[in-house]
């Protein structure tokens, strides 16, 4: 993939979705050799649009290597919970694996006032225009520690537009 990436035009890719070889020495397959992550990121950064996303699959210890290889662009991790476990050949020596990590990287940042927000389009939202009220004197929130002019300290109303936001655990049915 490192060779092919050099042929692609700069800043032309919205999403890089890849299940890299983990290269952890756990298999004897020729293809399971760890890719030089410095070179990989050099290629990814050249290809990505400014607000592009990189999603990489992994399991430990490879997940930690991925995150540490580019902490500046690391944004969050999701867990893909699979319907069927894997690793039956080693089931006498370790637990079966029922999940895989998905590590998300971007030049964009997470935050409502970001100059370059990360692309994020939550799916499956349920529209609900519900008026909610902030009550700073409720028993669970005393208002202390929020700063003098913080909206959490005042009795305010706001509208919740959607419900059913996704979590960082993903489940997909085979249907």
Feature map (PLM): residue ranges:
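Core catalytic lobe of class I
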Residues: 1-175
């Amino acid at each position: 993939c490192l060779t092919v990436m050099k042929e692609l035009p700069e800043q032309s890719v919205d999403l890089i979705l890849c299940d890299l070889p983990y290269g952890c020495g756990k298999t004897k397959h020729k293809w399971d050799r760890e890719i030089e992550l410095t070179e990989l990121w050099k290629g990814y950064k050249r290809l990505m649009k400014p607000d592009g996303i990189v999603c990489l699959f992994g399991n430990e210890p490879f997940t930690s290597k991925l995150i540490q290889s580019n902490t500046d662009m690391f944004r969050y991790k999701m867990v893909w919970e699979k319907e069927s476990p894997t690793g039956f050949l080693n089931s006498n020596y370790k637990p079966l694996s029922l999940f895989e990590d998905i590590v998300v990287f971007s030049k964009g940042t997470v935050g409502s006032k970001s100059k370059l927000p990360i692309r994020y389009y939550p799916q499956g939202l349920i529209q609900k225009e519900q008026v909610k009220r902030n009550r700073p004197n409720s028993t669970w929130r005393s208002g202390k520690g929020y700063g003098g002019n913080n909206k959490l300290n005042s009795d305010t109303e706001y509208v919740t537009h959607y419900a059913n936001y996704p979590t960082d655990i993903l489940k997909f049915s085979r249907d």
